[in-house]
Amino acid sequence: MKVTLLIPARYGSSRFPGKPLAPINGKPMIQHVYERASLAKGLDSIYVATDDDRIKDAVESFGGKVVMTSPDAASGTDRINDAIALLGLNDDDLVINLQGDQPLIDPISIEQIISLFERHPGEFEMATLGFEIVDKRELDDPMHVKMVFDNDHNALYFSRSRIPFGRDTNDYPVYKHLGVYAYTKRFVNAFAKLPLGRLEDLEKLEQLRALEYGHKIKIAISAFDSPEVDTPEDIRKCELRLAVD
């Protein structure tokens, strides 16, 4: 089983145009993501998946590899599906989907999600990461997706609302979703063909499509947060974190 990590990156963003190329401590954000991912053990290859020549040129300038995907990709999953077809991966190969706006991703978290598939072959089709919320401001922030899972760490639901809701107490752990996915090439192909889910459409969360159609998502709880860069204001926060990392 080969393990390929893909970093989907698009230039257009309503809140932050050109986000992948935003400089953080003298490097474009996409370079931070790529270089931190490359520290993870167990990866056979890493590619940035993009349809933009500016991103392609930036990645190749620091020695990274790029796969050029269709500009018509409607979602991140469609871009991943396009990339794995172009790369000619085998059905059983493992694909890691790491968002291009996570410059603080810890390589150990990537290794953790790979090990799930190695330790539990054939038990599930998709895996992702969670992190226990420590900043209480994130609890009711819809930009931080919350998650609940069963006793075997299979996902039950993802929501932009706080879940679970403590009727009589606020003293309980709440977990947020970290945007890293792992799945086989075969599953990505099948997932991309599924119609839009009702809950997926309401919450605007692609992973809900898998749950709505009866697929298991295994959860690994990471010891490391991986905050996403959503606005220009987030850049300064990343610079401060990277300075002491």
Swiss-Prot record:
<comment type="similarity">
    <text>Belongs to the KdsB family.</text>
</comment>
<keyword id="KW-0548">Nucleotidyltransferase</keyword>
<dbReference type="GO" id="GO:0005829">
    <property type="term" value="C:cytosol"/>
</dbReference>
<keyword id="KW-0808">Transferase</keyword>
<dbReference type="Pfam" id="PF02348">
    <property type="entry name" value="CTP_transf_3"/>
</dbReference>
<comment type="pathway">
    <text>Bacterial outer membrane biogenesis; lipopolysaccharide biosynthesis.</text>
</comment>
<keyword id="KW-0448">Lipopolysaccharide biosynthesis</keyword>
<dbReference type="InterPro" id="IPR004528">
    <property type="entry name" value="KdsB"/>
</dbReference>
<dbReference type="InterPro" id="IPR003329">
    <property type="entry name" value="Cytidylyl_trans"/>
</dbReference>
<dbReference type="GO" id="GO:0009103">
    <property type="term" value="P:lipopolysaccharide biosynthetic process"/>
</dbReference>
<dbReference type="GO" id="GO:0008690">
    <property type="term" value="F:3-deoxy-manno-octulosonate cytidylyltransferase activity"/>
</dbReference>
<protein>
    <recommendedName>
        <fullName>8-amino-3,8-dideoxy-manno-octulosonate cytidylyltransferase</fullName>
        <ecNumber>2.7.7.90</ecNumber>
    </recommendedName>
</protein>
<comment type="function">
    <text>Activates KDO8N (a required 8-carbon sugar) for incorporation into bacterial lipopolysaccharide in the Shewanella genus.</text>
</comment>
<keyword id="KW-0963">Cytoplasm</keyword>
<dbReference type="InterPro" id="IPR029044">
    <property type="entry name" value="Nucleotide-diphossugar_trans"/>
</dbReference>
